[in-house]
């Protein structure tokens, strides 16, 4: 009856090195899921997207932006047929999720290695797992065809985030490079 579509190639480096995998997973895969849902008469589909789909600057963001267009196109078709309700959530980084930067920083500190960052001024919009689940459930309960739900989240620079993780571990000797 219901689908929560979270399958994605979500790591920026993976999408940069393998852009066709990003296309096949994030765009074509989503289209396949939505066509199957519509054909099967699924009542509601909630798709998960990312803040990187807004003004995308890398292959992952571009693929997720196109994924959203696929979602909205399928939502229109399904609504015209009076069937499946398809909506979408878009949020930033879920703290401590697989592939997020916080576990990487923790591993680097524990190993006695420097914390490596590309640019200390890069901004990340952060939410915890409960906030992410609440957003998805809100979309599930209240979504209309083609709706996009965006969670306003706290922002942090990568540099400040690295310093905060250092402080949590009582670490004063690890360099941030």
Question: Positions of the model-derived regions?
Answer:
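The catalytic Tyr-centered alpha-helix of NAD(P)H-dependent dehydrogenases
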Residues: 59-63, 94, 128
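A structural signal for short coil/turn segments at secondary-structure junctions
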Residues: 40-41, 112, 143, 169
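Conserved nucleotide-binding/hydrolysis micro-motifs of P-loop NTPases
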Residues: 9-10, 52-54, 93-96, 122-124, ...
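AAA+ P-loop ATPase catalytic core
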Residues: 6, 139, 143
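Conserved beta-loop-beta element that borders a ligand/cofactor-binding pocket
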Residues: 70-123, 147-150, 174-177
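Mid/C-terminal beta-alpha module of Rossmann-like enzyme folds, strongest
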Residues: 142-177
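N-terminal Rossmann-like NAD(P)+-binding domain of SDR-like oxidoreductases, especially those catalyzing
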Residues: 1-84, 88
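Substrate-positioning beta->alpha
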Residues: 96-104, 118-137, 157-164
